[in-house]
Amino acid sequence: GKTILIDTGGKVDFGQKEEWKKRRSTSNAERTLIPYLKSRGIDRIDHMILTHTDTDHMGDLEVLAAKVSIQEINISKGSLKKDSFVRLLKRLNLPVKTLEAGDQLSIFDGSAEVLYPVEVGDGSNNDSLVLYGRFYGWTFLFTGDLEEEGEKTLLARYPQLRVDVLKAGHHGSKGSSHPAFLKQIQAKIALISAGEKNRYQHPHRETLERFKELQMTVFRTDQQGAIRFRGWNQWKIETVR
């Protein structure tokens, strides 16, 4: 089967570090992502999807590429407007393919379809690649850091969109998962990727309240650790700290 990875994670650097701190600092990929992939016997990624160019989504790409064979990097066309990102891609010298709404990637018993962006953006939050897929009877929506503006565009383009599992946009921030979006997609489960005690205080209490009002089951990486979907004919959800 194919292995698809959406975003690598990465540390946002909030200023200059002393040299000894730089040397001792290890990436999130070295601490968690790479060991996990190796533990599952994964040494090859067929599609490395980078939703957008924020460091906390693609900052560990170079570290990952040194340890795992990446067959193809998938990005939005707007991401190519960021010079530092383009320089990184050239340095890695790996196959790169841009994705746009309507493209499909085969995975499991179905495919993941790109729903967004619908036009060329700038690689920022509202230019995030959004993927929708139906796998073993459940529907999933992965939204990167998409915020309200992008969610409204998505609703206008796909007025019948319904999903079972939502990967909440922008780490559960206040500016994403707006009420009209949540009411339309009718997701039963929200997955929130956020660092423990992060400085942004993600997820925002307002967003959590919206999920609660709609009786959604919420899984949070800051509280429960890794969230794993396992199964073949049906899904079982596990959390691993």
Briefly describe each language-model feature range.
Residues 1-241:
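Non-globular, low-confidence helical/coil segments that flank catalytic cores
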